């Protein structure tokens, strides 16, 4: 993505040139944490997404993540304004914990709504399915209970015609587990983490081909850790990005 239509268009062109056919972007321009953002904010967000759509056409799937950082009033406005540009799905238009509000937004649009990275085990996903609050679930295998628990979640979702798009920004081991799950369920949609190659962590890095990762064939998860390379990374300090409104108050990044 990018904070201008021009930057966003160039970014998605580069991703498509690398072979990706399903891409997720963010809202990009952070608001001020207001309950209702300005009309200008809505227009800017839509202009950026529209530029991405125009740059690659309708053959590339483009999803957009609100990160659960948008108030429901603004989320509804943004979702409606994005409809003409056919997002693949909208992720976390609001926080998933208030399932009734999420369901209200889902009912207000034809765009598929996705959620799940902050939900845990089958019990965390049950209410979302029962209330039809989302049609795409994004469990994180590292947090939601592992391969077997997430397989159960996928089975529950199948009964509600909901798809699975596992959340995975973590690393090559988590991605390997996701790939095994993806290949074993009928309602798999897309896998996050396409830019994770495992370079410097596993002996045979991932290589996507035309937007797809080949299924592992080696024993276990199908990867072998590069212990020597990993040793150089022990103690690396990574922190979440931080975002602030114009008045200096902290907002969800």
Identify the residue ranges that each predicted region occupies.
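Metal-dependent enolase-superfamily TIM-barrel catalytic cores that perform enediolate-based chemistry
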Residues: 1-103, 108
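Shared catalytic-loop signature of beta/alpha-barrel
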Residues: 80, 86, 97-220, 224
């Amino acid at each position: 993505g990018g904070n201008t239509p021009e930057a966003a268009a160039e970014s998605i062109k580069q991703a498509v040139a690398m072979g990706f056919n399903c891409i997720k972007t963010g809202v990009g321009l952070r608001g001020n944490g207001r309950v209702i953002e300005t009309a200008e904010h809505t227009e800017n967000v839509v202009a950026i997404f529209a530029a991405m759509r125009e740059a690659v056409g309708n053959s590339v799937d483009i999803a957009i993540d609100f990160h659960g950082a948008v108030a429901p009033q603004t989320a509804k406005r943004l979702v409606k304004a994005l409809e003409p540009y056919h997002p693949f799905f909208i992720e976390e238009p609001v926080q998933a914990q208030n399932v009734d509000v999420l369901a209200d937004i889902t009912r207000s649009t034809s765009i598929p709504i996705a959620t799940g990275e902050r939900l845990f085990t089958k019990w965390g996903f049950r209410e979302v399915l029962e209330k039809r609050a989302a049609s795409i679930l994004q469990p994180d295998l590292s947090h939601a209970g592992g391969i077997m628990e997430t397989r159960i979640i996928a089975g529950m979702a199948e009964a509600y015609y909901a798809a699975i798009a596992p959340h995975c920004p973590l690393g090559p081991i988590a991605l390997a587990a996701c790939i095994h799950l993806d290949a074993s369920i009928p309602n798999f949609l897309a896998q996050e983490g396409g830019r994770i190659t495992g370079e410097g962590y596993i002996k045979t890095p991932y290589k996507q081909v035309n937007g797809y990762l080949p299924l592992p064939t080696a024993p276990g998860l199908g990867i072998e850790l590069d212990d020597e390379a990993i040793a150089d990374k022990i103690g690396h300090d990574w922190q979440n990005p931080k975002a602030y409104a114009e008045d200096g108050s902290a907002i969800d990044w």
